[in-house]
Curated annotation (Swiss-Prot):
Miscellaneous comment text of the record: A stretch of 270 kb of the mitochondrial genome is duplicated within the centromere of chromosome 2 resulting in the duplication of the gene. The expression of this duplicated gene (At2g07682) is demonstrated.
Main location per the UniProt record: mitochondrion
Protein localization: Mitochondrion
The organism's place on the tree of life at top rank: Eukaryota
GO cellular component, as recorded: mitochondrion
Region of interest: Disordered: 32-52
Protein name: Uncharacterized mitochondrial protein AtMg00870
Length: 184
């Protein structure tokens, strides 16, 4: 297992290089709305759900900004480690949110969609999750977590924990070390 200090050093070098040159790729146009249509809904509520889903996707695209697909030296994944870089902190997503009066709920939902998108790129196993926070005008120290997502309940707990963070997140990296990948 790769030590946490080595991971922190590699992550610092990686983010420094990423700031100089970012490999920009198209983000998947799949941002599931938190509420899907269920049986028994009226036509009016169905129309509202469809309209809200379109708004959700537009908000996610505008606030996520660039999404880069990269492979870190010590990461090995079925698909490259996905990095979400926001043009602005998620806390400011309230400006274009249709539920602007409930800005904190909107921010948490947007962050949940992002976490779902990143976690879906990986098998259910132990992974590393890196979060970057912006406080004021400077980038705060990155926080690394090693999590076990071998069950659906564990994945939901991880996504909920990320969504409930009070600090505005500007970067999320999900992946796992090569040594873990070879144990498959």
């Amino acid at each position: 297992m790769v030590s946490s200090s080595r991971i922190a050093r590699s992550f610092t070098r990686y983010t420094s290089a990423l700031q100089r040159h970012t490999i920009v790729t198209k983000i998947k146009q799949k941002f599931p709305c938190p509420r899907s249509r269920t049986q028994g809904q009226s036509r009016r509520s169905e129309t509202h759900t469809i309209s809200r889903r379109r708004s959700c996707r537009a908000i996610a695209r505008s606030n996520l900004g660039r999404v880069s697909s990269v492979t870190l030296p010590w990461f090995s994944c079925p698909s490259p480690a996905v990095v979400a870089l926001a043009k602005k902190p998620f806390r400011t997503a309230r400006s274009s949110c249709p539920r602007s009066r409930k800005s904190s709920r909107c921010r948490k939902s947007l962050l949940s969609w992002t976490a779902h998108h990143l976690l879906d790129e990986f098998p259910k196993r132990r992974i590393w999750v890196f979060l970057s926070f912006r406080i004021g005008g400077s980038l705060h120290r990155r926080h690394a977590m090693e999590k076990n997502i071998c069950s659906t309940r564990a994945r939901i707990r991880l996504i909920s924990a990320i969504s409930l963070l009070s600090k505005p997140i500007v970067e999320i990296v999900v992946g796992y070390p090569q040594s873990e990948d070879r144990r498959l």
